[in-house]
From Swiss-Prot:
Alphabetized GO MF terms: DNA binding
GO CC annotation: bacterial nucleoid; cytosol
Compartments (UniProt record): Cytoplasm, Nucleoid
Summary of the function given for this chain in its UniProt record: Binds to DNA and alters its conformation. May be involved in regulation of gene expression, nucleoid organization and DNA protection.
InterPro entries: YbaB-like_sf (IPR036894), YbaB/EbfC (IPR004401)
Gene3D superfamilies: Nucleoid-associated protein YbaB-like domain
Summary of subunit composition and partner proteins: Homodimer.
Protein name according to UniProt: Nucleoid-associated protein CHAB381_0200
Key words of the record: Cytoplasm, DNA-binding
Signal peptide limits: none
Pfam (any one): YbaB_DNA_bd
Stated family: Belongs to the YbaB/EbfC family.
Length: 108
């Protein structure tokens, strides 16, 4: 049943895949993303880790608290969605790499 099954080869492939996944995760964490709301009146910069790096607010919004709150909420929600999508894309790419393991260490 397990004739030709090379467990050490499979283990090596999984180790390589784990290293690649960690590398991809680190690269994504170091990326910066920017989202804007209100035609650019509010801009949020966020890291791939989901940490807010900077918030820019147009001076004209400082006297309109309600509009400022709405635009901040919109920008924050957009930033969260952007990071979630990036994580999903990263996961899909990693799953694609898993599919490339071929015979999973089995010799033909």
């Amino acid at each position: 049943m397990f004739e030709g099954f090379d467990l050490s080869k499979m283990n090596e492939m999984l180790g390589d895949l784990q290293k690649k996944a960690q590398q991809m995760e680190n690269e994504n964490a170091n990326r910066e993303f920017s989202v804007k709301s209100g035609a650019g009146m509010v801009e949020i910069k966020i890291s791939g880790k989901g940490e807010v790096l900077d918030v820019s607010i147009d001076d004209s919004l400082m006297s309109d608290k309600d509009s400022l709150q709405i635009l901040l909420i919109s920008a924050i929600n957009d930033a969260v969605k952007l990071i979630d999508n990036e994580k999903k894309n990263l996961a899909a790419k990693m799953l694609g790499d898993i599919g490339n393991l071929g015979g999973f260490g089995c010799e033909k």
